[in-house]
Structures are given as C-alpha cells and as structure tokens.
Amino acid sequence: MGQKSNPIGLRLGIVGTWDSLWYAGGGYASKLHEDLLLRSFVKKTFHHAAVSRVVIARKVDAVIINIHSARPGVIIGKKGTDIDRVKQKIAQMVNHDVELHIVEVKKPDLKAALIAENIAQQLEKRVSFRRAMKRGVQNCLKLGARGVKVSCSGRLGGAEIARTEWYKEGSVPLHTFRANIDYSCAEAKTIYGIVGVKVWVYVGDSRTGGE
C-alpha cells in the first residue's frame, strides 16, 4: 500500500518527526484545531516567502513556532517589524506568549512543498504543464536528489476531459520504510478549474544519512 499512503505519515518515527511537538492530557481537539489555524495563518501571511514547513511546540504558558523558509528576510522585514506584527497577531489568537523562530531552507529546490508551489504558480501563469514538471524535476536532481516524481491532475492545457500526467526521473522507493521521501501537494487555480500538483522527492536512505 506504499502507493496509496502519505509517505511522510507512513515513516513518522522511522524517518523524520512530527510537525506538532506537544502532549495534551486534555483539550486535545482544541489544541489540534489551533495548530491547523496557526499553520494556515502563517502560510497565508507569508505566501511569498517560500515557507516549506511550520513546526509548532508548546510549553505550559507559551507556543513556539519554527517557520522553515527559503526567504527569511521577507518574513523578518525591515528591522524585524513584520515578524513583530505577526507575533502580536498570533499571541491574540492563542492567548499565550509566542516565540517565533525562522529556519533558513538552504536548498529550496530539494523541498517537495516548494517544488509543488512553484509548479502550481507556473501553471497559473499558463506555462505548459510538461515544461513546468520537467524544470522542477531537473532542478531538484541537480542538487543531489536520487529521484523525483511529479503528477498534475485536472483539465491540463484546457482539455475538455480531466486527466493525470506524470513525470519521473530516478528512483522513488515508496515501499522502503528507511527511504527518506519528502512529499507535498499544491493547487493551481487556472481559468479552466483547479489543477492538483503532487511531488515526491527521494533524497537517500536514513541509515546512510540522507537528509
């Protein structure tokens, strides 16, 4: 069933860890809902800052948010004004003290979330889906990925009937638990309707230090 399950969720505890690092004895549902709202808020606020991951941890009286971004300067703003404003808004949302940490993504072309967003943006600008997929895959392989797979689903090129197109280079072993596979999806809102973009990136095995 490796083909049908989310590669990240399937490997939690083997390769990688959770995006929500906290334990709740009670009120779990409200905290989980709060996490979903915070992630959505951060990604909408910094949609132009290439945010690949938002990790949320909790103390008794504080919420710690680590934002992984390829453009940390865009988030921080001039003299930290932008990040301070966002910090205040989040503090009002959660009624707790908030710590915001920015983690720079040094190789954005290796992150599935950023590749998917980039392809979706190109599709919205009417770039050919084949060209967008091929460019994303080749840029990723140049940075050392061992395999990349991309799929686009919808009314591709304005076709009457929706279909799914795939582009793959290298190997993406979805059934191997030790394989470090990054996965993400994005939506392109085109004039013909929504096109779904999915990206799998295989960087290496965890036992060989693949990151």
From Swiss-Prot:
GO terms for biological process: translation. One of its GO terms (cellular component) is cytosolic small ribosomal subunit. The keyword Ribosomal protein applies. Keywords: Ribonucleoprotein, Ribosomal protein, RNA-binding, rRNA-binding. InterPro entries: KH_dom (IPR004087), KH_dom-like_a/b (IPR015946), KH_dom_type_2 (IPR004044), KH_sf_prok-type (IPR009019), Ribosomal_S3_C_sf (IPR036419), Ribosomal_uS3_bac-typ (IPR005704), Ribosomal_uS3_C (IPR001351), Ribosomal_uS3_CS (IPR018280). SMART domains: KH. Residues 38-106 form the KH type-2 domain. PROSITE patterns: KH_TYPE_2, RIBOSOMAL_S3. GO terms for molecular function: mRNA binding; rRNA binding; structural constituent of ribosome. Belongs to the universal ribosomal protein uS3 family. Binds the lower part of the 30S subunit head. Binds mRNA in the 70S ribosome, positioning it for translation. Part of the 30S ribosomal subunit. Forms a tight complex with proteins S10 and S14. This is Small ribosomal subunit protein uS3. It comes from Anaplasma marginale (strain Florida). The lineage of its organism: Bacteria, Pseudomonadati, Pseudomonadota, Alphaproteobacteria, Rickettsiales. The gene is rpsC.
